[in-house]
């Protein structure tokens, strides 16, 4: 699941550099919403990294490719372009030619950016383990006197396929 999502993310970044980044992102999101969201909402919903599978063909899904790319994009946004590049460079240097796993990739991101490895890996693995599409609610409070807008974001996840909701970072 790591290489599939990472490859799609890199392809999306390349396409954005070649064309209009905004147009490319809008197209990617439209595809995600019309195709992958339907998979997540249906009876075949599964995590980006399923705990088990009946056959390897079950790994060729929009969730693994497209949602996996969105996790890579979140890491890119969280760490910044330079931080993500440092983490990627560390990952390729450390694990070139090996059968690396998601934990190795996340560990590289943490090490290269001076973050607590255990906490970082634990937090980000949640995105790989839980099926379904998170719902984010926004509450805004405008304080006229200080002209300050406070946003409170709340993320919820419904139980899917017998799994319990798990708080996501």
Predicted regions and their residues:
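Short amphipathic, basic-aromatic surface patches that mediate peripheral association
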Residues: 153-165
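Hydrophobic alpha-helical and helix-loop surface patches within well-folded domains
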Residues: 1-146, 151
């Amino acid at each position: 699941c790591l290489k599939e999502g990472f490859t799609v993310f890199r392809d999306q970044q390349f396409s954005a550099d070649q064309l209009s980044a905004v147009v490319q992102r809008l197209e990617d999101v439209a595809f995600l919403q019309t195709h992958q969201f339907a998979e997540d909402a249906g009876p075949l919903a599964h995590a980006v990294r399923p705990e088990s599978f009946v056959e390897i063909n079950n790994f060729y899904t929009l969730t693994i490719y497209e949602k996996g790319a969105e996790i890579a994009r979140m890491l890119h946004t969280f760490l910044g372009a330079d931080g993500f590049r440092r983490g990627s460079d560390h990952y390729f240097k450390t694990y070139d030619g090996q059968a690396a796993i998601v934990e190795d990739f996340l560990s590289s991101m943490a090490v290269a950016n001076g973050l607590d490895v255990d906490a970082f890996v634990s937090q980000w693995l949640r995105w790989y383990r839980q099926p379904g599409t998170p719902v984010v609610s926004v509450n805004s409070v405008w304080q006229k006197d200080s002209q300050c807008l406070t946003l409170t974001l709340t993320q919820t996840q419904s139980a899917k396929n017998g799994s319990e909701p798990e708080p996501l970072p």
